[in-house]
C-alpha cells in the first residue's frame, strides 16, 4: 500500500466520475477521464436499479489497465449493473466505523451496521488498508495469555499479542473453542474482542450473535461478517475490516484486544477466486501467486505495540486434513502457537480435542514460562508419546505383554488424556456441567502430581471433562459411593 493511500484514510479527495465498460461476474472495468484514474484500493460507488429498488454497489480498484481503464472487484452482486452506468470515485479506501460505537453490533465488510442500519456512519471511520506498526513501536516483552484452559496453558501457551492458529478439519470444534475464548476473555479480563466471520455459514453467525447475547458478553464484542453467500471481494476484505476496528481499540484507546478470525482459510480461498477473476496465472494447487504477500499484509498488522496488544486467534480449515496444502502451510509461518484439533481425540469424547503432541508454542521454553512449567509439560508430553508408541504392541499382544513400567505409563497417559479435557462455559447448556477456569499454577501442580503417580489408584472415569483436582476428588468420591 502506498503512502498516498495511507494519507487518504479519513479524508476524501475530490471525486472523479467514470463509466462502466465491462462486467464479468464480480469483476467490473471502469473508464475514467484522462488523468483522473482513482488510486489502487479506492472505493468506487455506482447506483443501480433492480426491480424498482435503488441500491449502491461498492467497487474496489484492483488494477490499472492503461488507456484510462481500471479493473475493480465488486463488493456486492452485480445484478442490474450495465455498461455505461456512472461510477463515482469516493477518493478513499473502504472505511469502517471505529470506537465504542461498534461494540455489541454486527457489521459487514463495508462498515454497514446490520442489526441497526446507519449506526456509526456519522462518527469516526478508518480505512481498512493501513500500514503495520513501525519497528520502534513494537513491544519487545513476551507475556503469557492465561486462558484457564488446562491443555492450552500447559502445553501450548498463548502469547499476549501473538497469533494463534486453530487447525483442524470440519466438525472438530474450532468455532466452539473460539466462542469459549471470547466468553473467557470477557468474563475473566473484561477485555474487548473483535470477531471477523470470514466465509463461514450465515447460520453460524446468527447462532454466535444470539449465544453471545444470551451469555452477556455481546456488549464487549464487535462482530464483522462476510459470509459464504457473499462475493469473493467481501470475503477477502472482511478480515481487514475487523482488524481495523481492533487497531483502533489498541492504538487510540490503549486496550489489549482479542481478534478472532473464523476462518482464515476462507480469506485465502477468496483471494484465489479474485486472483483467477483478475486473470493472474495460478501457482501451486491453483492458489493465487500472491498468496504469501496477501497473508503477510494481514498478519503483520496483528501485533503488540508499547503497552497494548492485539492477540489473534485464527481458525484454519485444513482441506482434506492435508497440512502440506499451501493455504495452511503459508499460515503456519506467521503463528506463535498452533493448536491442532484432532478427530481421533474428539471421537473419544475428549473436548477440547487438542492434540498435545502436534500442537506447539514458541514460548514453551524455561526462560519464558519458568523451569517448573517447562519440566511438567515435557513430562506430560513424554508420557503421552510413550503411550502412543506402545499402542501397536497393545493392539497386537494386549496390555498383559507390557512391562510393569510400561503398564504404569499407559495408565497415567490415559488419565492425563482425560484430564486434558475440560468443561466449557459455552457447553453448559448441553452438558449440564458448569464451565471452569483453572489457574495456571493449579494446572501445573495437578499434572505434576498425576505424573508422580499420586492418582494411580483413581479410576480413569474420575478425570473425564473436569476442571481442577477438586473436581477429580469429587468425581472419585461419587464413584466410590456407588
From Swiss-Prot:
Signal peptide: none annotated. Its EC number is 7.1.2.2. Its main location: membrane. InterPro entries: AAA+_ATPase, ATP-synt_VA_C, ATP_synth_F1_bsu, ATPase_a/bsu_AS, ATPase_alpha/beta_chains, ATPase_F1/V1/A1_a/bsu_N, ATPase_F1/V1/A1_a/bsu_N_sf, ATPase_F1/V1/A1_a/bsu_nucl-bd. ATP binds at residues 168-175. It is a peripheral membrane protein. Belongs to the ATPase alpha/beta chains family. This is ATP synthase subunit beta. It comes from Corynebacterium urealyticum (strain ATCC 43042 / DSM 7109). The lineage of its organism: Bacteria, Bacillati, Actinomycetota, Actinomycetes, Mycobacteriales. The gene is atpD.
Amino acid at each position: 500500500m502506498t503512502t498516498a493511500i495511507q494519507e487518504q484514510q479519513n479524508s476524501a479527495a475530490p471525486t472523479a466520475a467514470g463509466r462502466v465498460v465491462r462486467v464479468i461476474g464480480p469483476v467490473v472495468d471502469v473508464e475514467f477521464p484522462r488523468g483522473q484514474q482513482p488510486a489502487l484500493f479506492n472505493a468506487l460507488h455506482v447506483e443501480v436499479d433492480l426491480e424498482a429498488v435503488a441500491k449502491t454497489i461498492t467497487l474496489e480498484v484492483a488494477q490499472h489497465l492503461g488507456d484510462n481503464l481500471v479493473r475493480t472487484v465488486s463488493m456486492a452482486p452485480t445484478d442490474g449493473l450495465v455498461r455505461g452506468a456512472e461510477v463515482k470515485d469516493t477518493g478513499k479506501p473502504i472505511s469502517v466505523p471505529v470506537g465504542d460505537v461498534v461494540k455489541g453490533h454486527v457489521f459487514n465488510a463495508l462498515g454497514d451496521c446490520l442489526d441497526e442500519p446507519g449506526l456509526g456512519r456519522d462518527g469516526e471511520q478508518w480505512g481498512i488498508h493501513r500500514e503495520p506498526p513501525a519497528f520502534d513501536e513494537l513491544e519487545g516483552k513476551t507475556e503469557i495469555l492465561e486462558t484457564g484452559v488446562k491443555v492450552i496453558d500447559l502445553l501450548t501457551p498463548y502469547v499476549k499479542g501473538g497469533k494463534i492458529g486453530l487447525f483442524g478439519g470440519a466438525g472438530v470444534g474450532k468455532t466452539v473453542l473460539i466462542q469459549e475464548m471470547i466468553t473467557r476473555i470477557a468474563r475473566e479480563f473484561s477485555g474487548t474482542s473483535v470477531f471477523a466471520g470470514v466465509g463461514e455459514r450465515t447460520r453460524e453467525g446468527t447462532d454466535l450473535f444470539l449465544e453471545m447475547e444470551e451469555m452477556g458478553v455481546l456488549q464487549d464484542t464487535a462482530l464483522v461478517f462476510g459470509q459464504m453467500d457473499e462475493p469473493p471481494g467481501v470475503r477477502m476484505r472482511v478480515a481487514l475490516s475487523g482488524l481495523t476496528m481492533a487497531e483502533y481499540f489498541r492504538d487510540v484507546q490503549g486496550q489489549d484486544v482479542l481478534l478472532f478470525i473464523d476462518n482464515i482459510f476462507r480469506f485465502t480461498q477468496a483471494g484465489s477466486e479474485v486472483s483467477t477473476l483478475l486473470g493472474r496465472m495460478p501457482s501451486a494447487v491453483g492458489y493465487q501467486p500472491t498468496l504469501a504477500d496477501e497473508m503477510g499484509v494481514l498478519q503483520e498488522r496483528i501485533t503488540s505495540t508499547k503497552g497494548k496488544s492485539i492477540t489473534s486467534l485464527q481458525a484454519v480449515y485444513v482441506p482434506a486434513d492435508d497440512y502440506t496444502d499451501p493455504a495452511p502451510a503459508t499460515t503456519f509461518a506467521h503463528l506463535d502457537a498452533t493448536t491442532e484439533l484432532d478427530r481421533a481425540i474428539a471421537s473419544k469424547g475428549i473436548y477440547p480435542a487438542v492434540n498435545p503432541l502436534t500442537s506447539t508454542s514458541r514460548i514453551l521454553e524455561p526462560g519464558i514460562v519458568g523451569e517448573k512449567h517447562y519440566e511438567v509439560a515435557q513430562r506430560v508430553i513424554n508420557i503421552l508419546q510413550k503411550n502412543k508408541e506402545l499402542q501397536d504392541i497393545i493392539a497386537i499382544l494386549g496390555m498383559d505383554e507390557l512391562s510393569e513400567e510400561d503398564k504404569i505409563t499407559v495408565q497415567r497417559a490415559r488419565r492425563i488424556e482425560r484430564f486434558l479435557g475440560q468443561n466449557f462455559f459455552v457447553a453448559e447448556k448441553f452438558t449440564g456441567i458448569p464451565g471452569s477456569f483453572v489457574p495456571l499454577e493449579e494446572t501445573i501442580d495437578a499434572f505434576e502430581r498425576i505424573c508422580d503417580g499420586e492418582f494411580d489408584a483413581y479410576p480413569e472415569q474420575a478425570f473425564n471433562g473436569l476442571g481442577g483436582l477438586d473436581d477429580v476428588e469429587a468425581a472419585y468420591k461419587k464413584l466410590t459411593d456407588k
